[in-house]
């Protein structure tokens, strides 16, 4: 008799995705981040659900309801900080997952990669609308500044911004709709993640060498299930350490002041995971130009498969490309630092140089390195 997991319509899907899935025998811990992202998503949906039971999306009570969650609800402070720091862990895993894809050439699975870019945009949108909900100073002014960027669109910009606001400024209508978006988007992310996985399983996983591994596959269970459980435990350990020891380490103190439309904070800045894009936005002295650069800094990922010039898929055996990859990482860390600094000398010029280098590396230097390495193969 055949095992039920191989015949039952639902069990068969799970079996083919997590149990009998043929997996390359040599994938490293950099391949753990996909499952960690799934774990993050589940944790965020669960903690978010419990927060939504006590939160009120109204300008007069939103800030107080968050304070009420932290003070009066049983373990409310814990759920709230798990959710806030869970977002940071989500983005750490997301950036590591993308870095892995860039380094090992996983972007050559084009459908999987493009859905991944779409997932990134959706997660960024979710994090942005979520940051507005506590209705602190940085929530309010962050929402005002970022939504205002749409006014740079010629002709329809102002109308578009007022349509998103539901009025002439960020107000009650804005908060209510942002709560609605923040509630629905994670479920859209879940659906997209399922499609992401569907397309990945059409091709199978890539591996560090970038060479097809069809002749050397092992079953996903037990080898990678146990490896993913270890990764998950380390993720939960890190999240708990962050939440229980320094819950406000990554937050902004300004968000403990209730939103006040009449008082602008001295330094408006987003959460750390958006600072690199914010630095690129600020480094262009023209509003529309800045908005376009901001969009392009993320959308450039779509073009990466087309910019592949090397005959080798992975960077494992490509020293020049490796060097440029780590320069790109250093550049992104520099942009993250600059995004959190005030707009003054020398930060302005450093930000502008880092922004130019970011686009130069992806569009010019890395494809050129690929061509040079192709020549070196013939020596």
UniProtKB/Swiss-Prot annotation:
Give the UniProt subcellular location, in the record's own words: Mitochondrion inner membrane
Question: Does the keyword section mention Signal?
Answer: no
GO MF terms here are: metal ion binding; ubiquinol-cytochrome-c reductase activity
Effect of substituting residue 300 to V: In strain: Isolate 1B and Isolate Timor sea
One Pfam short name: Cytochrome_B
Q: Provide the topology term for how it sits in the membrane.
A: Multi-pass membrane protein
Is Hydrolase one of the keywords UniProt gives this record?
Answer: no
Tell me the InterPro entries matching this sequence: Cyt_b/b6_C, Cyt_b/b6_C_sf, Cyt_b/b6_N, Cytb/b6-like_sf, Cytochrome_b, Cytochrome_b_C_euk/bac, Cytochrome_b_N_euk/bac, Di-haem_cyt_TM
A GO cellular component entry from the record: respiratory chain complex III
Q: Which residues bind heme b b566?
A: 97, 196
How does the cofactor bind to this protein, according to its record? Binds 2 heme b groups non-covalently.
Tell me the keywords, alphabetical order.
Electron transport, Heme, Iron, Membrane, Metal-binding, Mitochondrion, Mitochondrion inner membrane, Respiratory chain, Transmembrane, Transmembrane helix, Transport, Ubiquinone
Q: Which Gene3D superfamilies match?
A: Cytochrome Bc1 Complex, Chain C
Chief localization class?
mitochondrion
Q: What does this protein do?
A: Component of the ubiquinol-cytochrome c reductase complex (complex III or cytochrome b-c1 complex) that is part of the mitochondrial respiratory chain. The b-c1 complex mediates electron transfer from ubiquinol to cytochrome c. Contributes to the generation of a proton gradient across the mitochondrial membrane that is then used for ATP synthesis.
Name by which UniProt lists this protein: Cytochrome b
Q: Which organism is it from?
A: Stenella longirostris (Spinner dolphin)
């Amino acid at each position: 008799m055949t095992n039920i997991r191989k015949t039952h319509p639902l069990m068969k899907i799970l079996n083919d995705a997590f149990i009998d899935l043929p997996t390359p025998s040599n994938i490293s811990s950099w391949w753990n981040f996909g499952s960690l992202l799934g774990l993050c998503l589940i944790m965020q949906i669960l903690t978010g659900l419990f927060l939504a039971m006590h939160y009120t999306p109204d300008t007069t009570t939103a800030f107080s309801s968050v304070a009420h969650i932290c003070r009066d609800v049983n373990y409310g402070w814990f759920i709230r900080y798990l959710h806030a720091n869970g977002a940071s862990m989500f983005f750490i895993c997301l950036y590591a997952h993308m870095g892995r894809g860039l380094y090992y050439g996983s972007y050559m699975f084009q459908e999987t990669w493009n859905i991944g870019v779409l997932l990134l945009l959706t997660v960024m949108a979710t994090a942005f609308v979520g940051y507005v909900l506590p209705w602190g100073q940085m929530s309010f002014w962050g929402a005002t500044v970022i939504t205002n960027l749409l006014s740079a669109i010629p002709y329809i910009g102002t109308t578009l911004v007022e349509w998103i606001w539901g009025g002439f400024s960020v107000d009650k209508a804005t908060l209510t709709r942002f709560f609605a978006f923040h509630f629905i988007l994670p479920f859209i992310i879940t659906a997209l993640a399922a499609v992401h996985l569907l397309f990945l399983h059409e091709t199978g996983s890539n591996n560090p060498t970038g060479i097809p591994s069809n002749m050397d596959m092992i079953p996903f269970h037990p080898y990678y299930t146990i490896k993913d459980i270890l990764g998950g435990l380390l993720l939960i350990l890190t999240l708990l350490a962050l939440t229980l020891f320094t819950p406000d380490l990554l937050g902004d103190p300004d968000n403990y002041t209730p939103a006040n439309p009449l008082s602008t904070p001295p330094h408006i800045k987003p959460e750390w995971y958006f600072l690199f894009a914010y630095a690129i936005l600020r480094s262009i002295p023209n509003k529309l130009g800045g908005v376009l650069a901001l969009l392009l800094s993320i959308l450039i990922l779509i073009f990466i498969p087309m910019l592949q010039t090397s005959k080798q898929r992975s960077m494992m055996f490509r020293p020049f490309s490796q060097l440029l990859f780590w320069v790109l990482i250093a550049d992104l860390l520099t942009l993250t630092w600059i995004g959190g600094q005030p707009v003054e000398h020398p930060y302005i010029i450093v930000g502008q140089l880092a922004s130019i280098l970011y686009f130069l590396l992806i569009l010019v230097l890395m494809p050129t390195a690929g061509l040079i390495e192709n020549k070196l193969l013939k020596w």
